[in-house]
Amino acid sequence: MSKTLYQKIYDSHIVYEDKNSEAILYIDLHLLHEVTSPQAFNALRNKKRKVRQSKKTFATMDHNVSTKIRSIHASGSMAQKQMEQLINNCTEFNIPLYDINNPNQGIVHVIAPEKGMTLPGMTIVCGDSHTSTHGAFGTLAFGIGTSEVEHVLATQTLKQKRFKNMKVEIIGEMPKFVTAKDIILFIIGKLGSSSGAGHVIEFCGNVIKNMSMEERMTICNMAVEMGAKSGLIAPDEITYKYLKDKIYSPFGIFWEKSLDYWKFLKSDKNAYFDKCVTVDISNLAPQITWGTNPDQVISIDEKIPDYNNINSIVKRKSAKSACEYMGLQSNTYLTNISIDKVFIGSCTNARIEDLRSASKILKNKKVAKHVTAIVVPGSGLVKNQAEEEGLDKIFIDAGFEWRLPGCSMCLGMNKDRLNFGERCASHSNRNFEGRQGRGGRTH
């Protein structure tokens, strides 16, 4: 029987399956951070349980950390408490931790791939919705809730139903100045923020084949913004080259054996997909969101749509509400709208390739005097590499603040946030109301 990539990975991780209930899947890697793990550890203690596979568990601090100084005391009392709890929990249960003083510390979805922890064919979970990022490696990766975090810590398994299969084929030639972020935003805008609900999406096509791993991670990172459980891309030579000689990658004879298995990880020719979509990006222009949902997006040269012309009552109300919150009017160009802040960072776009691209545009240019702009590398490794290449100097000369690694302004859980009514051009993945701070407006 022909199978999709998702079905192959799912089936190979079944510990137990009953026709009357969901399957129990083995989890190869469990990623932790300071925000969604404290309650799970407390539950373990209350039930007198231990962590079943501490060596298949990895933790870092990212959501709450200060990007100005290396101190757990710099982001408020709640953040400090969560980071202290993570340190204590990892010490007690013998879990590897990149804490605030570790030179490798950074965003969990940046660290795991760059260290070779993320490998094709694995199952990976984390108490964070953008765990789908790891799907770029042909990995079944998805976010889980705190009660599920507890379950994985205790059993290294997770009860999980079978999701439907969706294929998004991306074809054409990538236009100049168009990035992976533009492509996935365009797809979300075209198909809708619930188009992937109940599905795992496999991205394929010549555009995907020509993408770097950094670009593929951006695509899979935002699969959840289509409502999908996760995103997947079949591994290939680009994947293998990226993983070769990483710290946690297989080596020697184990590398060769892994390659043999990884080459099997692709959808069979006649595999059935419940939904198939083909998207041609040959004429695509850079994309930017105007509203409070990722599917409220337009090309940079388009006007904000007139919500009065939207047929769907629900979408019309949503568009009107978004315009009111964002302080925008229909039929205007976003290029004429003034911004207050710029954020380059997040698990979507804070890797070395992203910083290189941004620095090329900024070289010999200056940030407007009224704009506050920050760059937050995704990890210590990315930061060090950028500094070796002199990218930090380009950003600083342009008027940007060069910060320490962390989630930063992607979400309002630390001191990097928007003030009420401020408008930000952001590299992050969500433009929800208040996402970057109460009353903040995100593009």
Swiss-Prot record:
Pathway in which this enzyme or protein is active: Amino-acid biosynthesis; L-leucine biosynthesis; L-leucine from 3-methyl-2-oxobutanoate: step 2/4
Asked if Ligase is a keyword of the record, the answer is no
Q: Which reaction does it catalyse?
A: (2R,3S)-3-isopropylmalate = (2S)-2-isopropylmalate
Q: Please, which domain of life does this record's source organism belong to?
A: Bacteria
InterPro entries attached here? 3-IsopropMal_deHydase_lsu, Acnase/IPM_dHydase_lsu_aba_1/3, Acoase/IPM_deHydtase_lsu_aba, Aconitase_4Fe-4S_BS, Aconitase_4Fe-4S_dom, IPM_dehydratase_rel_enz, IPMI_cat
Which positions in this protein are listed as binding [4Fe-4S] cluster? Answer: C347, C407, C410
The first-level EC class reads: lyase
What are the required cofactors? [4Fe-4S] cluster
Q: Name one GO molecular function term.
A: metal ion binding
CDD domains per record: IPMI
| The record's free-text note on cofactor binding | Binds 1 [4Fe-4S] cluster per subunit.
The enzyme's E.C. designation: 4.2.1.33
- Keywords in alphabetical order: 4Fe-4S, Amino-acid biosynthesis, Branched-chain amino acid biosynthesis, Iron, Iron-sulfur, Leucine biosynthesis, Lyase, Metal-binding, Plasmid
- Mind telling me which residue stretches traverse the membrane in this protein? none
**UniProt cross-references to PANTHER family, sorted A to Z:** 3-ISOPROPYLMALATE DEHYDRATASE, HOMOACONITASE, MITOCHONDRIAL-RELATED
Q: Which family does it belong to?
A: Belongs to the aconitase/IPM isomerase family. LeuC type 1 subfamily.
Q: What does this protein do?
A: Catalyzes the isomerization between 2-isopropylmalate and 3-isopropylmalate, via the formation of 2-isopropylmaleate.
Subunit note: Heterodimer of LeuC and LeuD.
Query: What is the designated name of this protein?
Result: 3-isopropylmalate dehydratase large subunit
UniProt source species: Buchnera aphidicola subsp. Uroleucon aeneum
Q: What is the lineage of its organism?
A: Bacteria, Pseudomonadati, Pseudomonadota, Gammaproteobacteria, Enterobacterales
Name the gene for this chain.
leuC
